[in-house]
UniProtKB/Swiss-Prot annotation:
Keyword list, A-Z: Carbohydrate metabolism, Glycogen metabolism, Glycosidase, Hydrolase
Lineage: Bacteria, Pseudomonadati, Pseudomonadota, Gammaproteobacteria, Enterobacterales
Compositionally biased intervals (Basic and acidic residues): 458-467
Active site: 336, 371
Matches recorded under SMART domains: Aamy
Functional description taken from the UniProt entry: Removes maltotriose and maltotetraose chains that are attached by 1,6-alpha-linkage to the limit dextrin main chain, generating a debranched limit dextrin.
Record-given protein name: Glycogen debranching enzyme
A family per Pfam: CBM_48
Organism, scientific name: Shigella boydii serotype 4 (strain Sb227)
Amino acid sequence: MTQLAIGKPAPLGAHYDGQGVNFTLFSAHAERVELCVFDANGQEHRYDLPGHSGDIWHGYLPDARPGLRYGYRVHGPWQPAEGHRFNPAKLLIDPCARQIDGEFKDNPLLHAGHNEPDYRDNAAIAPKCVVVVDHYDWEDDAPPRTPWDSTIIYEAHVKGLTYLHPEIPVEIRGTYKALGHPVMINYLKQLGITALELLPVAQFASEPRLQRMGLSNYWGYNPVAMFALHPAYACSPETALDEFRDAIKALHKAGIEVILDIVLNHSAELDLDGPLFSLRGIDNRSYYWIREDGDYHNWTGCGNTLNLSHPAVVDYASACLRYWVETCHVDGFRFDLAAVMGRTPEFRQDAPLFTAIQNCPVLSQVKLIAEPWDIAPGGYQVGNFPPLFAEWNDHFRDAARRFWLHYDLPLGAFAGRFAASSDVFKRNGRLPSAAINLVTAHDGFTLRDCVCFNHKHNEANGEENRDGTNNNYSNNHGKEGLGGSLDLVERRRDSIHALLTTLLLSQGTPMLLAGDEHGHSQHGNNNAYCQDNQLTWLDWSQASSGLTAFTAALIHLRKRIPALVENRWWEEGDGNVRWLNRYAQPLSTDEWQNGPKQLQILLSDRFLIAINATLEVTEIVLPAGEWHAIPPFAGEDNPVITAVWQGPAHGLCVFQR
């Protein structure tokens, strides 16, 4: 049998050099590491990794080639109270594997044991890593590098976006290839999108609980191999990487950036009753935050929490991010439950991973977006991330919904959110673009459901409607569910228009949820993470062309307003913004706090947003000048208005002079 040479301790993972493959694995507490390779017949061959440099185990297998399937068996103590759960009976995934062969099924053999180790061998059914070689012609690809102040983000699911699109070839619908199809790219361009933000594409597993109910993890926030693409989105698993890069190259040629939603807060190994795939068996004590009793700190709600203050885990996370930028040319990341990135265990702006990103010449140059919270004490960190990061602005989401959907909200609070939440983000040299404004996202109601449902309807998730938030700030306008009278449909449409206008004409970086622009509904499910079906797939045949045109016109209008595309904070008297009451006078202190929901926002001294969010038709006295409504608010008859606008109940209009 071929003997392993010592090889090199870097880089981590399996790397083919034309003559053989170098294997490296981090484990600070292992006593022995076996490389297990599998031939075409599934026969396993084991080799002890002979190299041991610090905490890196390594070896070189001569004559090994791309396509080789492999895994690891890691020997060490079984001491649960100390956080050690080594079990060499279990084949483990390389954390840096770039392709996985096999499925992560619910099987007792894929568990290590809870209090006592399960010594049943699982190599016959365990997924295997695959050695890959990287040859790809990027041609003249270059990142668009869209400035933050010109960025319009579109959050989408790879499968859900295109699976039902009638103009995309059936054989590629729901895949990476479909993202780069001319029909999809033309649609995004016409809409005005500059950045496509994809829900997780790194390989993930469905939780055993979901599998037992006949469901699956649709969103992908359950990662198992952070360097490998999820194969279900590929036409062929063997060509997934090239399919993904082809799509990115096509999107870049159209000037559209690609941002990946990435999960660096927990793994698919879940809690101590969860499956054993990789990290738990390689070095549980190093990779996870461990309590004094040996259990996990569950700061994510997913059973475990990655210890991103450990130097080796910081190196692992940094290498993962660099891989996606350097190998796939992605333009940025949205970090799920990003407060975990700053835990030491207290949240710190100078936490090791933040520092590593800031000091990296690659990662410091891409777009970085934080979901700025986790579920632990002190986990809500909106506004507290380092200056390189933009952040999801849930203050904006809640304020926009409360203002337009008949909840109490003072004008001052609404104006503050409209002005990029300067009270939250104007610190440490940050600019207005740091506020990622959103009204909806993948988790929560869609925009249409916000105006059709007062309550969540998550029964299909199998948890008796207990899952998902109850704080939706939604309004069904008098009838629970879709459909209704013409008057009801029109009132809901007006609310959708108002929310979209607030989102797309406010200061900050807007993020639009895919499907909101044509009225997609999840029938009241506000936590559709396990619904891989018509509930979440966008039905393009039912798309509202009128709403799509309205959204595109708003985005086009946004790009014409200097106050919205100049990335600087609005100051009193700078000509960017004036806040006026219904009589075109500056608002008094009392009006800011107690006045009716009537407001005029004058932007760049030429564009006026007139708002009447009350339930009564109200005369709005416009500022001096000749005003005319502009698309998408202008009708065929668009007379010049010089004095008064008859503001319909729950309405708004945008004028230019």
